[in-house]
Amino acid sequence: MNKEIARYLQKISVDSRFVSILEDRIVVNNLRYSRFSRAREEIFYHKFPEVRVNRSKVFQRIATRASRNLKAELKPRDRVALFRDGDCVSQTLYAVLEPYTRKYGIEIIQFELWGELEQLDVDKVALPFHLDCEVESLLEKMLNGDKISLESDRTSFNDHKLIYPLINIPRDWILSWTGSEGIPCTEDGSGGMAPEMVQFLSSFIPDVREKMYKSAQFLRENE
């Protein structure tokens, strides 16, 4: 179905490298580059009336930010493993990666149990790890008096290269998109003091997550 949709999009002059083709919807990653005008949308609906086209500005921001990491992390025809569950972050990660099956010709291989990973022939593992995960981990280390380090600095596991496409994406963006789309998924709940502190600080300090992440990067580079 996805290949059929991609071919038809090409036929009506829509660049499918800038849209995510999901089960029952198409999500625009970049409206300008995709050239998915309202007129082309109407033409598309004549062929695929059951597939909804979504132009979420939140998802376009997510895709644009994630692309900065993916440009450096992905190579043509990479085989990328992705953990499949009902989590909102994992579903967002799949939506972000899906266009790269056409941009770079990557293959996405989904798995349900971490024990399966050892049996997979893949080049990279894309982890559903976002900006709030990193910042909350930094705060936990600070509160415990531990050395400051970035979880996303871990780049390999059992000879598999690890990548973090959503590392600069806040949790709020992810939940805003999945919520507005009505995507059935579970939130990555994290309890404790650190998440509450991040929320508290964000009400006073603009872009506090990004600033904490950059500070940790600076410390790492200047050790």
Where are these regions (language model features)?
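RNA-binding accessory domains that recognize and position tRNA/RNA substrates
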Residues: 1-107
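Short beta->alpha junction loops/turns
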Residues: 33, 86, 131-132, 167, ...
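Mid-to-C-terminal catalytic subdomains of enzymes
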Residues: 3-9, 13-17, 169-217
